[in-house]
């Protein structure tokens, strides 16, 4: 099993945090091999950002793949820039609060979640990435959900009041992902 994932969006949407959390939690809690490769645009907050995460049973030959099983897009420019890198049969995860453009491919699975609006609705606007991570894990089963929940607890160990809200946000996304899994 090997999953090639790209997460792309604006700086400030938690793109890197989402990828790093997935990679670190998977590395710590499983026997899987993982790579995380960040790529920043010219500006941090508000500029473009993307990262690659590869999860595999076998040794990973390259940390970046331009032939993706999974693509998470948190904004419209990322959809247009990277949609052609998604393999037929791949999974496209869309932040449908912001990305409203139609997807002109019928050979992929599209999983939509209004994660920006959801994060605002729960009073935690910075949790959109954790919600989307839940959507991803719920739809793909790339790693067991408990792996990410442990990763959230580890990430926020110095700010324990943030653990429960982020685990709850992750679980909200998890349910959406499970409901839309193909």
Could you say what each language-model-derived stretch is?
Residues 1-182:
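Active-site cofactor/cluster-binding pocket
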